[in-house]
Amino acid sequence: EMCIRDRANTKEIKTRIESVKDTRKITNAMYLIASTKLRKARNDLDRTRPYFEALRTEIKRIFRTQNDVDSRYFYPPEGEPPLEGTYACLVITADKGLAGAYNQNVIKEAMHMLDEHPDTKLYVVGEYGRHFFTQHNIPMEHSFLYTAQNPTMQRAREICDILLEGYDRGDFKKIFVIYTDMENSLTSSAHCTRLLPFHRAYFQTDTVEKAVTTPFEFVPS
């Protein structure tokens, strides 16, 4: 009887060892996949950053050379009444919840905005965000069905078109985006950034640049 029991225990131990080995293989495979996706995301970010910085520089040049910009896409000059009204917020989350605080921090920023401005219209990218707001009976103005993990220019244009149409109609006075900023491979943080209207303070730097004398024409005005 003792021998039978010992054999059973030995077999159970071997089974557990094999199970641990299989789990380790799966974990290593998941790690390799995650590392590959992280490198791709980093490369995509590095490729798009020059375009972002160039656009930021052009907007800064406009503010530096045009003191009184009369456009609905620019914040009113100092001394004029501030913009009041409904906000629009583009909330970008992942499709899955296995991402640590990645999604929770974005949701926390979105809930903070809703606490401050309850009439904010939500535009949501990512299954995690859609599920959270639906589960908590928080209305969404629009939820985009494609994944945030596979962004394309076409999808970005579709989002921009919907937001700009609402902005031009006067459905909301300001557009914000809540997203995760990748500081390095180990650190990321949620940010809330206003997209429209542009504000002079957002583009002020200590860098001295050559003045531009060519007049600007805004289309649409």
Report each predicted region and the residues it spans.
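C-terminal beta-strand-loop-alpha-helix "lid" module of Rossmann-like NAD(P)-dependent dehydrogenases
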Residues: 5-221
